[in-house]
Every structure is written in C-alpha cells, then in structure tokens.
Amino acid sequence: MNVLVIGAGLAGSEAAWQVAQAGLPVTLVEMRPLRRSPAHHSSEFGELVCSNSFGALSSDRAAGLLQEELRRLGSLVISTADHHAVPAGGALAVDRGRYSAALTEALDAHPLVTIERREQQRLPEPGQITVLATGPLTSEPLAEDLRAFTGREDCHFFDAASPIVEGESINLEVAFRASRYDKGDADYINCPMNQEQYLAFREALLTAEQAELKDFEKDSATFFEGCLPIEELARRGEDTMRYGPLKPIGLWDQRWGDVTDRDVRRAKRAYAVVQLRQEDKDGRLWNLVGFQTNLKWGEQKRVLQLIPGLENASFVRFGVMHRNTFLEAPQLLQPTLQFRQRPSLLAAGQITGTEGYAAAVAGGWLAGTNAARIARGDAPIDLPATTMAGALTHFISEAPSGKFQPMPPNFGLLPELPERIRDKRRRYGAYRDRALADLAPFSSAPKVAEATAAAL
C-alpha cells in the first residue's frame, strides 16, 4: 500500500524517508513552490525558517539527547544536519542552503519516494494511510477541513503560551500550595505580592521590551483579545491584573495565621497573587497561569524573577505569542501519533504541539515508522517515556486536561530517577544514560558519537 505524507518540512521529510527505508512506496506532497507559506522562502525540503540551530549538541542537554536518539534511530534529517554543520559553539547549526538542498536531493533520489508538488486541500479518505505534517502554517483549505474533522475547539490557530518553570526552582518558603477557597486539592502554587511588589512588577512589565511580530502574524493580532498578553493587561490599568489572573481573593497561606480571624486576614492577606498550575503528571513543570506574553525572552526572565518565590526560577519554556496551527493533542492523538478517531491518520511535527526542530524530526520518525508498520499489518510502536523522543509523544498525548500548549524537549518531561542526584550535570547525565539504554532495542547505532558526548 502506498503511504501518503503531507508536508515536506522537517517532520514530513523524516516520515517519508522512514516509510521508504521500510521498503514501502510513499508519496510526499509539498505545496511549495506552487503556493508558499508566509514564512518560507524556498521550495527545498526541511527549510529552517527561523534559527539555523537544532540546539545544544552535548547529549547531557535535552536537545542534544534528542539529537543523539535520532542518530541512533537512523534519522535522515539529523544525519544531513551533521554533514552540513557549521561552527556554533557547542550547538548543532547548519548551512541552511546546503542542508536543505541535500535533504531534498536524498528524498528525490530514493526509488520508493514519489514527490508531488501540489496543495493538499482536504484530508484523504479514511482508508488511506497518511502522515499529516503540515506544520504551524497549514494552508487555510486544509486547516478548515482539519477543523471539521477534529471539531473547532480541538484545533488552535494562534499560539499564546505562558512560561513554564521547573518546580524544584520555586521557593516554597515564600510561595504556597492552595486552591482558591480551598476547593478540591491544593492544585496550585501561589506567589503572593504586597502592594509595593505588585506596583514594581507592573512597572517592569510596562517598560520591558517586546518581541516584534512578523508581518504575517500582525493580521492575527485581533486574536489576542481572547487571551491578552500580561503586559497588555498591565497597560490597561493599575488594578487590571489584580482583577484578572493575579486576583488574590480566596487564597490563603496557613503560615499567615487563622483565616477566620478578621484582623489577621486584613493584616496578612496578599495584595495580588501569581498562580502556577501543574503542567505534567509528576508535578515537575509548572506554568504561570494567564501569563501569555510577547516580551523578549531575556526580558521575561528579568521581569518574572521579580515575582516573590520565583527569584531563582529555572525556565524550561518562555511565553510566546505567534501564529501556530496545532492540535489539542491530548484529546486527539495516541502516543503512537495516530488519531484516536482514525488510526490510519497520523500527525507529526509542530502541528502535534511539540516545539523545536529536533522534536519535529522525532515526531516524523515515529509517525513514518508507524505508518509503515500499519501498512504492513504490524502493530504500531511507541517509544519509552524514559527517552526524550518518547517523553515528548507521551506528554502531548497524555497531558492533563485543560488548555494544552506546545512543549519543547526538556528533562522535566522524563520520569524521576530511582535515586535523587542533586548535582544537575550528573543528574542530566544519568537521564541520558538511561534514555540511551532504553532506546537500544529500537536503534541501529552502537554507541554515542564522540561529538555528542558530555563535556567534562
């Protein structure tokens, strides 16, 4: 059976290659150059539209570990990136032109790959095994058909993500666990502010430097009204945040005293409260509720560390606001990247809610591998959650209910180690060793390349 792959970006290119390498014919559909997205400039496959870097090369870094896993899994994209790497001070960066040309040439030369330059405007019929890898700028006709297939509430068309911090970096001598009015469990971490702290925080927001929207994103600026950036709330008035995401009502730290004592309550209650909500099953990652923002990343760190309890916060993702088509993956996808309602349809890349080049490649590898397995009548696979690639796919398919937001590779996604290791470098090295050992049954490379070994 011929497998269809829609989109020849990082994920689609990898998916098509894995299908072909499994000995099955695959049709790779790419609308460029007949129709270009606002962000693309060439008709080559796997075009890198933002940075030319795949992230840190060292395998004791999250991005580097994911790259090494992909090397071991026989990734075409990572192999091509390695061959066209440029000096980048410990990161895997590439010569964009040579890299994309080589990737395109490899796929074009494969005898089992048929390339069709056309726009796919509808999802194929249910009997067709398909990998959907159309990326964050999916064309409107296909996006509309995807909306109809998933339900509008399950397909987002503007990404407004709040920052995420590591739970262990939150100062719980200042912050406290509680839910508003003590309803349910103490599901939130709360960072209280007095009036002076709140006003200083607001002033920092008002003066912080914002990221510039791209031209094609400015047309979508009206979408912000439904999820206003925190700096816009600050601009709307001194108390706007306090009556919005920073409202303190119903939140009390038991260390402050007896909440039923009116005098204690008046003396101790917070002027404003920043809430953090659990992002993963194990409570190791926490997002700042209502803190979608368009501030530059360096400014975010500076301003958000003014929040009491977050003075030393370690950020695994900064807030972003940009156009980004992505699925409500926990409701729609299995860890195999198959759609729950149509197992012959798989998704890969940024459209699934992963962030970063290497994460897109990992999704392409798994979706392509499983498309080939389904076509042969074999059961699909999912990678161990102890690997970075597996942790990402398990996260997007199993994230807690609520507002799902894209996630980059990070060690906070991995299950805890059997024994706690306080030194971060040694801990990340242990995560790496476990991940690569657990990946061994799926991989073909015998050992870690010297270039990706941890710097000692």
Curated annotation (Swiss-Prot):
Cofactor dependence: FAD
GO biological process: tRNA methylation; tRNA wobble uridine modification
Protein EC: 2.1.1.74
First and last residue of the signal peptide: none
SUPFAM superfamilies per UniProt: FAD/NAD(P)-binding domain
Location of the protein in the cell: Cytoplasm
Gene Ontology cellular component annotations, sorted alphabetically: cytosol
Entries under Gene3D superfamilies matching the protein: FAD/NAD(P)-binding domain
Keyword annotations from UniProtKB, A to Z: Cytoplasm, FAD, Flavoprotein, Methyltransferase, NAD, NADP, Transferase, tRNA processing
UniProt GO molecular function: flavin adenine dinucleotide binding; tRNA (uracil(54)-C5)-methyltransferase activity, 5,10-methylenetetrahydrofolate-dependent
Family label: Belongs to the MnmG family. TrmFO subfamily.
Role this protein plays: Catalyzes the folate-dependent formation of 5-methyl-uridine at position 54 (M-5-U54) in all tRNAs.
Cited HAMAP family: TrmFO (MF_01037)
NCBIfam families: gid_trmFO, PRK05335.1
PANTHER family named among the record's database cross-references: GLUCOSE INHIBITED DIVISION PROTEIN A, METHYLENETETRAHYDROFOLATE--TRNA-(URACIL-5-)-METHYLTRANSFERASE TRMFO
Protein name: Methylenetetrahydrofolate--tRNA-(uracil-5-)-methyltransferase TrmFO
Organism of derivation: Synechococcus sp. (strain RCC307)
Gene name as annotated: trmFO
